[in-house]
């Protein structure tokens, strides 16, 4: 199913109500990472060039349905003004007569930013009345907030009941690349799934399994799979309640002739602490007193080998305790291998995206997804409310 996009509409003189994802990290009122703001620029610039009056809306943080100036979008308005080279007017609310009046005074090419939509509890409740109030500021609804596409909120899907709805360039790109992974991946297709828990990744593992030729499983969840295979995992993370689930998953992989790569050597520690001394274990088995913290050199060699000939790669989740520098090598090396892969490469999920950015490799990846939970749910095959309302 394809989505309607901004290229399908005439925006001249129209009010484009654009849902962006400006949920950026702030420290003492200053933006520490403006990646999400920059990601919205192509859509905003295009709408301006088409003569639209651009009305932007977003959430920021969790103000719990109350007006809390700590979560005001004012810093975003300032940064947008700098990036666009024009004044972006910040409105003091997102609904109401004053907002409608301010929007009605806009000229073609003007850009305004509404205040945080989550200052109203009705936003997350997907209140019909609140969605209707928001819709009064637009003629066409543009959803460019892939990061919140898995939420059925008033500003992400409710507004589409009142206005024609299309996707912005960011939404279109996410749908195109993640959709390609699920619908028609070119073989050999390698899935690399990391993260700490089987429970949080089993749905994406099961969704990608029938499409994959090779599946790499790393991170804390790998130890539950190794336990199923009969190996010693020491004091490593184990989800006993997922032993049967992991066992039937490995059986299914065998039936489908999918090669599953689990760690064959490890970097371990005596305690789960940032400054624990890393030790190398040249074996699949982990000593009883040790905790698996990262994948070892032999495992990395194996992953490098399958990636060198892959035509499609999806990577979601870290391969070790990436937040501790001593145990980040596995994730860092995999980021490098994915970047050097000649095929289509898609990276989604907070830590894997952070790894790619940390080592300045994002320019070598075909597509770096902007959605954490949204990417995961998309790859699980779930219907995302923010995308469903855009479908043709």
Swiss-Prot record:
It comes from the Bacteria. Pathway: Carbohydrate degradation; glycolysis; pyruvate from D-glyceraldehyde 3-phosphate: step 2/5. It is an enzyme of class 2 (transferase). Substrate binds at residues 21-23, 36, 59-62, 118, 151. One of its GO terms (cellular component) is cytosol. Keywords: ATP-binding, Cytoplasm, Glycolysis, Kinase, Nucleotide-binding, Transferase. GO terms for molecular function: ADP binding; ATP binding; phosphoglycerate kinase activity. It catalyses: (2R)-3-phosphoglycerate + ATP = (2R)-3-phospho-glyceroyl phosphate + ADP. The keyword Phosphoprotein does not apply. It is found in: Cytoplasm. Its EC number is 2.7.2.3. GO terms for biological process: gluconeogenesis; glycolytic process. ATP binds at residues 201, 292, 323, 349-352. Pfam families: PGK. Belongs to the phosphoglycerate kinase family. Monomer. This is Phosphoglycerate kinase. It comes from Borrelia recurrentis (strain A1).
């Amino acid at each position: 199913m394809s989505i309607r996009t901004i290229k399908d509409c005439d925006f001249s003189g129209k009010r484009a109500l654009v849902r962006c994802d400006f949920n950026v990290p702030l420290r003492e009122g200053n933006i520490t990472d403006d990646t999400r703001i920059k990601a919205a620029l192509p859509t905003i610039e295009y709408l301006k060039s088409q003569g639209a009056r651009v009305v932007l809306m977003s959430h920021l943080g969790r103000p719990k349905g109350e007006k809390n100036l700590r979560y005001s979008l004012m810093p975003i308005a300032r940064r947008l003004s700098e990036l666009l080279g024009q004044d972006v007017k910040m409105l003091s609310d997102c609904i109401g007569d004053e907002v409608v009046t301010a929007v009605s005074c806009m000229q073609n090419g003007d850009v305004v930013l509404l205040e945080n939509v989550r200052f109203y509890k009705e936003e997350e409740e997907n209140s019909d009345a609140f969605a209707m109030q928001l819709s009064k500021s637009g003629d066409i609804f543009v959803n460019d907030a892939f990061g919140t596409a898995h939420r059925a909120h008033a500003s992400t899907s409710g507004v589409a009941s009142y206005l024609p709805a299309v996707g912005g360039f960011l939404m279109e790109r996410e749908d195109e690349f993640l959709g390609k992974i699920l619908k028609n991946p070119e073989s050999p297709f390698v899935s690399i799934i990391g993260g700490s828990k089987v429970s949080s990744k089993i749905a994406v593992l099961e969704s990608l399994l029938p499409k994959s030729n090779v599946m790499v499983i790393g991170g804390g969840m790998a130890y539950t799979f190794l336990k199923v295979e009969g190996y010693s995992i020491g004091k490593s993370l184990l989800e006993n309640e997922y032993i049967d689930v992991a066992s039937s998953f490995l059986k299914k992989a065998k039936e489908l002739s999918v090669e599953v790569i689990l760690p064959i050597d490890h970097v371990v520690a005596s305690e789960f602490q940032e400054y624990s001394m890393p030790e190398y274990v040249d074996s699949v088995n982990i000593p009883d007193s040790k905790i698996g913290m990262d994948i070892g050199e032999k495992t990395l060699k194996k992953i490098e080998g399958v990636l060198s000939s892959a035509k499609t790669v999806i990577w979601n989740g870290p391969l070790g305790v990436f937040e501790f520098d001593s145990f980040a090598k596995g994730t860092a090396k995999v980021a490098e291998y994915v970047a050097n892969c000649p095929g289509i490469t898609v990276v989604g999920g907070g830590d894997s995206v952070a790894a790619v950015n940390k080592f300045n490799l994002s320019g070598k990846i075909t597509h770096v997804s902007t959605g954490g939970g949204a990417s995961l749910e998309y790859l699980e095959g779930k219907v995302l409310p923010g995308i469903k309302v855009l479908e043709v």
